[in-house]
């Protein structure tokens, strides 16, 4: 079964409405489970979510994106902050946030000396230039082991 067929099946089963556009995989997505494109109505999904978290979580993410999709084409509020979106997401048991991926590993850990805020980074940062985003305190590198 193709991804578009799967999304059509979920749309009919959980929303009672047809999905009339295309769904595709997007391997470039890192921290999000999927994306809705209002301009042409297509959906992109992160294949790593299905691989790492299974079909149950992936189906909830499909529901999340279909909430955006159906609300947009009905002319209702389709953004995360809109009440219509939040209510529909609760009704269909969709995920509000995508779960963290194990494949996204941080190599560097920086801690603010003043407030204790932690920052995980894949790439090193210049401690002479960058400061804490919360309190503007000095950052120190903590060894990851």
From Swiss-Prot:
One of its GO terms (molecular function) is zinc ion binding. Pfam families: SprT-like (PF10263). SMART domains: SprT. It comes from the Bacteria. GO terms for cellular component: cytoplasm. InterPro entries: SprT-like_domain, Uncharacterised_SprT-like. Binds 1 zinc ion. Its main location: cytoplasm. GO terms for biological process: response to stress. Residues 5-140 form the SprT-like domain. HAMAP family: SprT_like. Belongs to the SprT family. This is Protein SprT-like. It comes from Streptococcus equi subsp. equi (strain 4047).
């Amino acid at each position: 079964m193709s991804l578009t067929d799967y999304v059509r099946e979920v749309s009919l089963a959980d929303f009672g409405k047809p999905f009339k556009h295309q769904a595709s995989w997007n391997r470039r997505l890192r921290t999000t489970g999927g994306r809705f494109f209002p301009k042409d109505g297509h959906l992109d999904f992160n294949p790593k979510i299905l691989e790492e978290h299974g079909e149950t979580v992936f189906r909830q993410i499909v529901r999340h994106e279909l909430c955006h999709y159906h609300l947009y084409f009905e002319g209702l509020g389709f953004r995360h902050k809109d009440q219509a979106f939040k209510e529909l997401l609760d009704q269909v048991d969709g995920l509000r946030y995508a779960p963290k991926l194990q494949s996204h590993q941080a190599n560097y850990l920086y801690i603010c000396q003043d407030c204790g805020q932690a920052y995980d980074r894949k790439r090193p940062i210049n401690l002479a230039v960058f400061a804490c985003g919360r309190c503007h305190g000095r950052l120190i590198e903590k060894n990851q082991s």
